[in-house]
Amino acid sequence: MSSSDLPPLGFLAVEVNIHRPPGDPYNPRTWPFPLVHELVPGSQEKQIVSKETYDAEFINRFVASGKKLAEKGCVGIITSCGFLAMAQRQLSERIGVPIATSALVQIPSIRAFLGPQKIIGILTYDGERLGDTHLQEVGVDPATVRIRGLPATGHTRKVIQDSVKYDSGEMEREMVDSAVRLVKSIREEGREAGAVVLECTQMPPYAAAIQEQVGVPVYDVYTLGLWFYSGLVRKTPASWIS
């Protein structure tokens, strides 16, 4: 079966017009299976990247768009911002097909892999707005993680908020530096950093560079999507067939 013959994964797109290179979950070249987009109206950065609970109208728009993807034959759905972890339970209850809203949903499994003592670092787009509510929504004890945001006046924020031209070299330097600082801060507590989870969907293209510098497992929406889809659509590897 070729990748084009596989059932599609749905993607809830938001109203943020930015460059999305391979590795970004919006880009079809990121995935080894078909991807179908559905734009959610009223989904700008300031509405999504929030520490406040989403209101009913906001959730309803995501539900409506998610149901459209289900009607198009999508076997599951992912989204374009890790802050949508705060909507995980509501969306999974109402859309009708499995949905993985955020890279953060992997953390309970990562915790099981690592054992109870190691700290999981979260690198996020905005460290001021990502907090306990997002974590608890996906079953994460805030005491077991440490959060670090990208610089408030850095390149990534300027690209998304101010439409500054995307510079991949600058993005990589900023993300690698922030991840190194995150892991260093954990070690300065006298704790061991077990893994880093990249919250932002702009981060996966730079995950390998981050891992090279921090030296621990690195998870993101790409690792989530591959795991998620592999259970939705099982394929028997050719090497298994005699």
Predicted feature descriptions by range:
Residues 171-192, 205:
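A short, acidic, amphipathic alpha-helical segment used as a generic capping/interface helix at domain edges
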Residues 17, 76-88, 103-106, 125-129, ...:
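Gly/Ser/Thr-rich loops at beta-strand to alpha-helix junctions
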Residues 1-59, 126-129, 133-167:
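N-terminal glycine-rich anion-binding loop in soluble enzyme alpha/beta folds
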Residues 199, 203-205, 219-242:
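C-terminal functional extensions of proteins
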Residues 90-114, 211-229:
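Short, acidic/small-residue loops that bind anionic groups at enzyme active sites
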